[in-house]
UniProtKB/Swiss-Prot annotation:
NCBIfam families (alphabetical): formald_GSH, PRK05417.1
Role, per record: Catalyzes the condensation of formaldehyde and glutathione to S-hydroxymethylglutathione.
Residues that coordinate or bind Zn(2+) 2: 48, 50, 53
Cross-referenced InterPro entries: CENP-V/GFA (IPR006913), Formald_GSH (IPR014185), Mss4-like_sf (IPR011057)
Names of the cofactor(s): Zn(2+)
Co-factor note (free text): Binds 2 Zn(2+) ions per subunit.
Listed pathway(s): One-carbon metabolism; formaldehyde degradation; formate from formaldehyde (glutathione route): step 1/3
Originating species: Aspergillus terreus (strain NIH 2624 / FGSC A1156)
PROSITE patterns: CENP_V_GFA
PANTHER family the record matches: CENP-V_GFA DOMAIN-CONTAINING PROTEIN-RELATED (PTHR33337:SF40), GFA DOMAIN-CONTAINING PROTEIN (PTHR33337)
Molecular-function GO term, any one: S-(hydroxymethyl)glutathione synthase activity
HAMAP family to which the protein is assigned, alphabetical: Formald_GSH
This protein's name: Putative glutathione-dependent formaldehyde-activating enzyme
């Protein structure tokens, strides 16, 4: 039996709308839902195998994208949010009642500071950018996945057109490297 990657992948990837303007994300509580409003589509939406991201029950991967911080606002029941791990680089704000991570924010100096991490599957609106790649794929082994079955996982991602990486996609890794080079004076700030 095939392991569950993520419902947005296992059930077939639905192409997003490049003109999509955003929408609301809701926690899983039956009432008094935490609501987060996004004023734009996400970018770099991807399957993530890290151990920190929120995943649907039984899924090996999360699907997470980013939006500019100024395009995210908590619009209902924000008092239910708490930071899951205050020592983590990405401060994941989760609902105290249902446990769903509503958004992750970086508050320290980091290449992705200013971008908030979100799970668009928490929206009831269609049009969000579809997953673009799978990152931190080998990390599922650290969570107990059988390493002998990794080729099956990678093959399933490739079958739906997603490249797999054991970090992030090359453009995102280039962004991190360029940030570090600028910070260390090795690259002009204008580049």
């Amino acid at each position: 039996m095939n392991p569950i990657l993520h419902p947005l992948i296992d059930n077939g990837i639905t192409p997003g709308d490049p003109n999509f303007a955003g929408g609301n994300l809701y926690c899983k509580c039956p009432q008094n839902k935490v609501t987060v409003t996004l004023k734009s589509n996400v970018a770099h939406n991807h399957a993530c195998g890290c151990s920190k991201c929120w995943k649907p029950t039984g899924a090996l991967f999360s699907v997470v994208g980013v939006v500019p911080r100024e395009n995210l606002s908590v619009t209902a029941n924000g008092d239910k949010l708490h930071v899951v791990d205050k020592n983590a680089v990405i401060q994941r704000n989760a609902c105290r009642q249902c446990g769903v991570h509503m958004f992750g924010r970086i508050e320290t100096e980091h290449p992705f500071k200013g971008l908030d991490f979100v799970h668009v599957e928490l929206s009831d609106t269609r049009g969000w950018q579809e997953p673009q790649f799978a990152g931190f794929v080998s990390s599922i082994i650290e969570q107990g996945f059988d390493p002998s079955k990794m080729e099956t996982v990678r093959s399933r991602f490739k079958a739906v057109g997603l490249e797999t990486y054991d970090s992030l996609s090359p453009p995102l890794m280039d962004t991190i490297a360029a940030y570090t080079a600028r910070k260390n004076g090795k690259l002009s700030a204008r580049l």
